[in-house]
Amino acid sequence: MLKYCARCVMPHTKPDLHIDEAGVCNACRAYGQRSEVDWGRRREELLTLLGKYRRHGSNWDCIVPVSGGKDSTYQVIRMLQLGLNPLCVTSTTCDLAEIGRKNIENIKKLGVDYVEFSPNPLVRAKLNRIGLTQVGDISWPEHVGIFTIPARAAVQFNVPLIVWGENAQNEYGGPAAAAKDNVLTRRWLEEFGGLLGMRVTDLSSTYGIGPQQLLMYQYPSDEELQRVGVTGLFLGHYLPWDGLSNALIAQANGFTTFDRAVEGSMVNYENLDNHQTGIHDYFKFLKFGFSRATDIACLHIRRDRISRQDGLEIVRRHDGKFPWSYLGKPLAKILDPLEMSVDEFIKVCDQFTNKRIFKRDGDGALLKDRHGNLEKLNYDNA
């Protein structure tokens, strides 16, 4: 049985989530403390910090890792408003959607220099398959690349400051805010990047992928990071962070949304770049019993935009549906580069399904409806 937060709709199975004696999760508690934050003071801290890294025309002031999504569009807009000269860096996603390409081009039109690093697609497809079958995450190589490539760019272009968006795991401003020891280490990057227990070196020793094919997935050495003084900050620590308002600001600056709620979601303004995202989100549902619709519903419940009851109904309607398509692209075509059939994919799904949280028949087999959807044992506390 799943236990749910009494304020939002997040189950206790979410990694790093804790539900206290009152039945409230730590994410809701943390959000409640935001009203006590002096955002004016935080903004001044941000301006002071950014001032230390301004190059006054001699180089870029900072690196902004961007995907083309609403949040990275917002980050670029804010950096420009604050008078910085950012270098935008993209580690191109696995299966870039047309709308994702459009939003990347839109960021360029905001008036920034832009580096787009596209991985070897044959190697990436192998890594997608390895990630999916070994750790249940088709997006494993993408999640590695979005941290390694900006760090490599920082070293290569001698730009110490990396400006990330929101840090969902830690309530702090990032290493750049530290009075000392503020240079990123390889260990910090690997821990923050979240490798899910599979190291890049494993790929060479176990799967025969040569190190020369994995350069973009490896962090710079500590010596390289120290030489440049690479550090980073999280913009969401210094400015109030809200996905919906970020989306509205991004839209006002040319960002394009989908023509309907994205499959498995409840909104049309996020995760628009990669056709593989539906698979990634579905595996989160299989492992932990929640997915994208739950994530978004919780954000809106905490901000009093929807009631908890409405959130429960939205989650039941949208969360964890079998990913037959994403952004309109059929599952079979998404799996083609991985050389995997839909039947093979379903077998992998079953291997990673947490059978303790889904309904089964008398023989222990998972119960699925005619669309292949699972049903959780419970969608709320009894």
Tell what function each PLM region has:
Residues 1-62, 78-382:
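Nucleotide-activated chemistry modules centered on ATP-dependent adenylation/adenylyltransferase
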